[in-house]
Amino acid sequence: ALAKSAISSRQNDSHKGDYGRVLLIGGEAEMGGAIIMAASATTYSGAGLVTVATHSSNKTALFSHLPEAMFQDFDDEDKLKTSLASFDVIVIGPGTNNNDHTLDLLQTVINYATDEQYIVIDGGAISCFAENNLSVPNARTIFTPHAMEWQRLSGIDIKDQKEDINQEVCD
C-alpha cells in the first residue's frame, strides 16, 4: 500500500530531465561495485538522469551494468566543481575509504553544493566527515550510517545506541 501511494505514473509528455538529476560520487578502484549498486538503485527507483563520478577503472563495469548512466572521472576536480550545481541530489561515499582523496571530494561537495540541493553522505565519507569535524553543509543533508559510523558521528558507543539517546543527538 505504501509503494502504491508513493509511486505514480509518468506523464506521456515528460522526459528524463523531469525526474531529477543525481550525481553519485565514490567507487575507489578496488571498490567500484558499491557505487555501481548505488547508481543502479538510484536509476531503478526512478531518478531521471544519473551521473557517476568514480575512478576511471570503473567506467567499463559501470556501462556494462548500467548503460543509461553517465560517467565522470572523480579525479577531474575542475569538472566536478563546475558540474555540481546542475544536480538536484548529490550522493557521496559509496565505495570510498576514510582517506585524503575522499576528504578532498567531500570538501568539494560541501564547498560547492547549494542550499537547494540534497546531499547524501554515505560510507567512507561519513568517517571523513566525523574525523575532520566538518560542518553540515545545509539543512538538506542526509547521513546513512551503520552503527560504527553512527558512533563516529555522534560519539555514542554502539552498546549505548538507543532510539531516545540517538534522537537527543539529532535534536
Describe the residue ranges of each PLM region.
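Small-residue (G/A/S/T)-rich helix-start motifs and N-terminal tracts that mark the onset
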Residues: 1-119, 127-142, 147-171
